[in-house]
Amino acid sequence: PDRRPPEDPITPPPPTKEEQRAGCGWRNENGVGFRIIGDKDGEAKFGEFPWMVAILKIEPVNDQDPEGQKLNVYVGGGSLIHPQVVLTAAHYVATAKTLRVRAGEWDTQTTKEIYPYQDRDVTHKEIHKDFNKGNLFYDIALLFLSQPMEMAPNVGVVCLPPRNERAEAGTRCFASGWGKDKFGKEGRYQVILKKVEVPVVDRNTCQDQLRKTRLGRHFMLHSSFMCAGGEPGRDTCRGDGGSPLVCPIQYEKGRYVQSGIVAWGIGCGEDRTPGVYVDVGNLRDWIDDKVAGRGIEPTVYTY
């Protein structure tokens, strides 16, 4: 008697859009605002990965005239982990003087997107003290922005894994990036943000695969790295250094955690060699420490 008749269910009101998507890591699987007809090979949809940022360096057009006209030169990818903090690979930003971060970008050749991109200047960067540009150990950096980005349908933050948590082998994750050297008209390679789905590869398997390459049979995979990919024809060279590798959060459809940062690869997914990524979970303590050190709460990217 204490059961409701099945023909009279209680249906809760649908959650409002805002409420549903509080917190980090929400991917817009169908894009934002408009549908792309004929989804071309590997193109991300507009706003699909709202944490994806482009890192630009500002250079004078003419070296002899440093105060003259300036160019935004594309350096690599990164991810927004807080409205004012970007996570990226150290080897792209270690030597650059003036950096700018662009969030909410999608097609670099047009400004017709329904939600605009947002640019911020980098006022402070933290490079891991053990970063080694020879072998790329600890290839991780944080960029702190002059002003927070405004959260928008095409601009959001990604979640980070709890400390030392590694994505399980076989998990299917996404790497994304533009893979091009310049923004705008001079740009070569990709104009529209690309994505590639890659499986996480177990560390030992990865090390064995890498030993078959020119790295040789004594190669040791350093603890600051993880691996993904190695499926023929799914080529991760498209991703750019510094770009995020995001994996689905179990039991939360549409929500993602950044397990890796694109670091390096041998060849291009030919002969099943996985790509190598910075292991974010392994460096979570370092990230929290540097973020908190600048008075920012790590709770934003914690799920």
UniProtKB/Swiss-Prot annotation:
<comment type="function">
    <text>Binds and activates processed prophenoloxidases PPO1 and PPO2 and thus is involved in the activation of the prophenoloxidase cascade probably following the recognition of pathogen-derived products. Binds the A.niger cell wall component alpha-1,3-glucan, a fungal pathogen-associated molecular pattern (PAMP) that activates the host immune response.</text>
</comment>
<dbReference type="GO" id="GO:0006508">
    <property type="term" value="P:proteolysis"/>
</dbReference>
<dbReference type="GO" id="GO:0004252">
    <property type="term" value="F:serine-type endopeptidase activity"/>
</dbReference>
<dbReference type="InterPro" id="IPR001314">
    <property type="entry name" value="Peptidase_S1A"/>
</dbReference>
<feature type="disulfide bond">
    <location>
        <begin position="206"/>
        <end position="227"/>
    </location>
</feature>
<protein>
    <recommendedName>
        <fullName>Phenoloxidase-activating factor 2</fullName>
    </recommendedName>
</protein>
<keyword id="KW-1015">Disulfide bond</keyword>
<keyword id="KW-0964">Secreted</keyword>
<dbReference type="GO" id="GO:0005576">
    <property type="term" value="C:extracellular region"/>
</dbReference>
<dbReference type="InterPro" id="IPR001254">
    <property type="entry name" value="Trypsin_dom"/>
</dbReference>
<dbReference type="InterPro" id="IPR043504">
    <property type="entry name" value="Peptidase_S1_PA_chymotrypsin"/>
</dbReference>
<feature type="region of interest" description="Disordered">
    <location>
        <begin position="1"/>
        <end position="24"/>
    </location>
</feature>
<feature type="disulfide bond">
    <location>
        <begin position="173"/>
        <end position="247"/>
    </location>
</feature>
<comment type="similarity">
    <text>Belongs to the peptidase S1 family.</text>
</comment>
<feature type="domain" description="Peptidase S1">
    <location>
        <begin position="36"/>
        <end position="292"/>
    </location>
</feature>
<feature type="disulfide bond">
    <location>
        <begin position="237"/>
        <end position="268"/>
    </location>
</feature>
<comment type="subunit">
    <text>Heterodimer.</text>
</comment>
<dbReference type="Pfam" id="PF00089">
    <property type="entry name" value="Trypsin"/>
</dbReference>
<dbReference type="InterPro" id="IPR009003">
    <property type="entry name" value="Peptidase_S1_PA"/>
</dbReference>
